[in-house]
């Protein structure tokens, strides 16, 4: 099997239905576009409605603890910081959206001049957390708060799930050595 980079470079034609984000994102790129397409259509809608600069506050929380475990262990803060610090859009990214035919020039200018301006608060990583309590709070222009929603949720959910499982295994082992295979 060919390495991922070679397979990606061989793909020269655009599929009949258009571009897929998974075809577009390569390992050499930042992960800004690795999110729900919905987030970008919402931001474009905010520009259309003229409310993109309205200040918004989003809270990250979860509704229930997996397997009735009582609590979860918060993890993923470092990854979230790295993802937020890496948010940027190239002309190639903007061209991807332009080819979709449903985004405005205001949206393209926003991407071209993007600088993350939100405030982000988080509890300390490794803290036990409980359902329906804010874990991360993002406050800033609606256009930006919306864009990081999926990225925050995916990172928080996965990293917290792994940390919670590790905590449960260690507690269940009661001091004995453990090996976990997934």
Residue ranges of model-derived segments:
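Polybasic, lysine-rich low-complexity intrinsically disordered segments
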Residues: 2, 12-13
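Ordered alpha/beta subdomains of enzyme catalytic regions
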Residues: 4, 8, 17-182
